[in-house]
Amino acid sequence: MQPFNVILLQSDSRVAQSLVSALANNFGSVHQVQSLGELRTSIAKHRAGVAILDMETASMSDVEHLSREFPTACIVCTHRLADEDMWTAAVNAGAADVCPPSDTRCIVRTALRNASMTQSAAA
């Protein structure tokens, strides 16, 4: 199984560092970016299988555009105040899940599950 690359857009630097540490144990490489434009460029450049997107820096429309532009990438959204309505909207827009940014287990589990499903489908 080929390791997946992850692109991370997270506005809180402490949370970002925690996520980078957790993700680095499970993925080929983790690249942290500072903007949505940089996220798009990095997904293409690194052929990322996973994009983790802070919903405080992006809109549902952004999630929808990313999922159309990169249909094989697993998009995991994070938001500190996510509720059921936000989760439903994000999943309908193409995200795999919405997790609290502090729940690194949920984020890693979602990314691993969806990345392995994508790889199985491609095989």
Language-model features: where?
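Negatively charged, flexible loop motifs adjacent to catalytic sites
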Residues: 38, 58-60, 81-85
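Acidic, metal-coordinating helix/loop segments flanking the phosphotransfer/catalytic sites
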Residues: 34-50, 58
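Receiver (REC) domain switch/output surface
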Residues: 103, 107-122
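Alpha4 helix (beta4-alpha4-beta5 surface) of REC/receiver domains from two-component response regulators
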Residues: 79-97
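Two-component signal transduction core modules
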Residues: 51, 75, 98-99
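Conserved phosphoryl-transfer motifs of two-component systems
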Residues: 96-99, 105
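Short amphipathic alpha-helix used as the core "switch/output" element in two-component signaling
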Residues: 60-72
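Two-component/phosphorelay signaling modules centered on CheY-like receiver
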Residues: 12-34
